[in-house]
A protein has these predicted regions:
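Intrinsic disorder/low-complexity segments
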Residues: 15-17
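Transmembrane beta-barrel domains of Gram-negative outer membranes and organellar outer membranes
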Residues: 19-153, 157-163, 171-270
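Sec-dependent N-terminal signal peptides
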Residues: 4-13
Length: 270
């Protein structure tokens, strides 16, 4: 029994070390979390555009139902409209439909969908379904692992629900949004993997863009980030996104830091 337990720990550690560079900070990879596992996240986002500083807190639960299907449930709380309050929530699901594995490399493709609700009025054409807008989104993710380097691209389309009862006169009423991203992650440490207790240190660089089809307005953000993974179960993310180019005004995510802690529990779902 003890030998089986040790083997399970080694497998978990190998999983975290091999795929750690795919755990992007601002986007999701096509790969899924381990089967029958639960993850708990707490994320804090701080924005410097208001002109005052505002922040959002996102508690999140993730469920790995199988190697191909996982789901996230999020709640959004912020002080963007005065006092700190609950803004809404979101359900996100991802289905991996393609896997191609080779030694030290693999390719994954997945489809995702999201439905969100938010109490907030809109101040911008940008559609952000993680706190700012009610709506739905769908898209595709493609991820390529090449030893210590992981590359991923995402293409999505979002539709915002009508919120005329909360709309402020003269402010934009966004309807649809095309989103796209290109993400890279590199495993810096450990240089040589020995056991699952070794910390993993990863660096990321992500390009995050959106286009409003109705107005033609768009933007492209650059988002560097660092990440530490401890004991294959605890993950700490720190990142910052800033605009490289664009003409979409009043965006909340234009200059934003992200700080996240994640805790994973393996083989707990029946």
């Amino acid at each position: 029994m003890r030998q089986i337990f040790v083997l399970v720990l080694i497998v978990i550690g190998t999983y975290a070390s091999t795929y750690a560079q795919e755990l992007y900070v601002f986007t999701e990879p096509a790969s899924n979390m381990p089967t029958k596992s639960i993850g708990v996240r707490i994320t804090n986002e701080g924005m410097f555009n208001n002109p005052d500083f505002v922040s959002r807190t996102i508690p999140e639960v993730m469920l790995g139902f199988s190697k191909n299907l996982m789901m996230h449930a999020q709640a959004f709380l912020s002080d963007m409209d005065g006092k700190y309050r609950l803004e809404g929530g979101s359900i996100y699901a991802k289905y991996r439909f393609l896997s191609s594995d080779e030694t030290h490399s693999h390719f994954r493709a997945a489809a995702f969908g999201r439905v969100s609700t938010s109490k907030r009025p809109t101040y911008t054409r940008d559609i952000n379904l993680e706190g700012d807008n009610s709506g739905i989104q769908g898209g595709l993710i493609f991820t390529q692992l090449l030893h210590k380097l992981a590359l991923s691209s995402t293409l999505g389309y979002a539709h915002a629900f009508d919120n005329s009862d909360r709309q402020i006169v003269g402010m934009p009423q966004p309807k649809n949004m095309l989103s796209y991203s290109l993400s890279s992650g590199y495993l810096v440490l450990p240089v040589v993997y020995k056991d699952y207790n070794q910390p993993n240190f990863n660096v990321y660089l992500e390009l995050l863009g959106k286009t409003d089809p109705s107005s033609g307005q768009s933007y492209l953000d650059i988002a560097p980030a660092i990440q530490m993974i401890l004991n294959s179960k605890t993950r700490i993310d720190l990142g910052y996104r800033f605009q490289a180019t664009g003409n979409m005004d009043n965006r909340y995510t234009k200059n934003m830091y992200l700080l996240r802690a994640e805790f994973n529990f393996f083989n707990v779902l029946k």
